[in-house]
Amino acid sequence: AAVLVQAAPAAGAQPAKADAVTAMSMKDLSAFVKDEIGFSYNGYFRSGWGASNNGSPKEWAIGSLGRFGNEYTSWFDLQLSQRVYNENGKTAKAVVMLDGNVGQSYASGWFGDNSSNDNLLQFSDIYLTTTGFLPFAPEAELWVGKHQLPKHEVQMLDWKTLPTDNGGGVGIENMALGSGKLDIALLRADIDQYDRTLSHSQQLNTNTVDVRYKAIPLWNNAELMVNGRYAMGNSTDEQKANVNDNGYYKWKDTWMFGTALTQKFNNGGFNEFSFLMANNSLASSFSRYTDSSPNTAFNGRYYGDHTNGTAIRLVSQGETYLTDNVIVANALVYSRGEDIYSYETGAHSDFTSYRAVIRPSYIWDKYNQSGVELAYFNQENKDQLGVKYKESGYKTTLYHAFKVDTSLLTSRPEIRFYGTYIHALNNELDNFSFADEKNDQFAAGVQAEVWW
């Protein structure tokens, strides 16, 4: 690539064409330099302003009612990547990612890790990834460090169907196998194992095997993935004695398996259908109506009598263009479990949950859309005595968005102006209320969301 320098045009000349050539050459030069030094900086954040009709606005049940007009925090991810080797068909790249949250309530934003502080920061990734070093799979990526296999997110509900707890590990991704590709990882994620008073804990070593066979072609624009995960404990003799003699909850190995089918549409939309089944503590995560990502512990705390109960989850998510000017996104979730430990209703609980979020939008042009997000959920838990508890509610959000493309789920940056009404119909699981013990809230605000 070369930089083209243009002399000043003669009187009456049209410089536009030459200017375009100069701009293109600079773009090519920038891409060349970026590739030559092997450095990239990627990120994501969301932030904004919001107010309610009665005091500070409150979020509620984002994992069931959706994010639009229902989040008042500034989450961010910042990733730095530097290629450190690229010779003889082998590459090595160092990657570091920071993520966290900045509160939108107070003017100051000092970071801390106490439960009342909204300002949080962590290193979620720090690893070395390579290609060309595996003689049996030179095309595959081999990575070592704090990392995990790619997450699969239900974007409208802000939780993941496929995350994996990870403190450090080793993994192989994109290894060609038959008609698809294989990902496999071995991950460590220690947890705090609590006693029955929840006042004492011990550090329990756990390790997880995560396997996925993906990109299996089915028919035109459709592919399949199958996945499996098994988390096992590694207790010391002293820790086993604490379980037997001092009232600590017993660790139970936990597994999850499932499949996902992704169909891309010719008009640019897509839909993903997934099925998951899990037992023990991973199944407990299925019963949560807020953050429903399948984790082996509750915010790093392991407790509860897990009795090999199981739960299933069916998810549909995606977007489709009904016409050139109308697009609709969806997130539909059905979950059911039997004899699981619920963090709300205890051991030997059964539950059934329905969630539906629909977001139709009218496309005025490439840069403007107006729409509504409609959401409803209903969950019923039954404890071991047969007592039933219900949690349900609905949300209506009207919005107008400034955009850079027409997709609801894959185009950013975006600025959205919204008004949201949320009504909690039943709250027997969390006893939640908005300000002044009210069961509803109207809020208005503006939010920016961007990734690069």
Task: Please provide the spans of the model-predicted regions.
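Beta-barrel outer-membrane channel/assembly domains of diderm bacteria
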Residues: V3-A137, E173-M175, E319, P360-Y362, ...
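Hydrophobic secondary-structure block in the mid-to-C-terminal portion of proteins
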Residues: A10-A13, S199-N205, Y376, Y389
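Residues that define the transmembrane beta-barrel architecture of outer-membrane proteins
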Residues: I37, A51, N70-F76, N119-S124, ...
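Membrane-embedded beta-strand positions of outer-membrane beta-barrel proteins
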Residues: Y41-F45, A94-L98, L142-V144, L182-L186, ...
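Transmembrane beta-strands of outer-membrane beta-barrel pores
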Residues: S47-N53, V84, L98-Q104, K146-P150, ...
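Surface-exposed coil loops of outer-membrane beta-barrel proteins
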Residues: G48-F68, A107-S124, F136-G247, S293, ...
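Short linear functional motifs in flexible/disordered or boundary regions
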Residues: G55, A92, Y106-S108, A140, ...
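Detector for outer-membrane/organellar transmembrane beta-barrel domains
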Residues: V211-T236, K240-D383, K390-T396, F402, ...
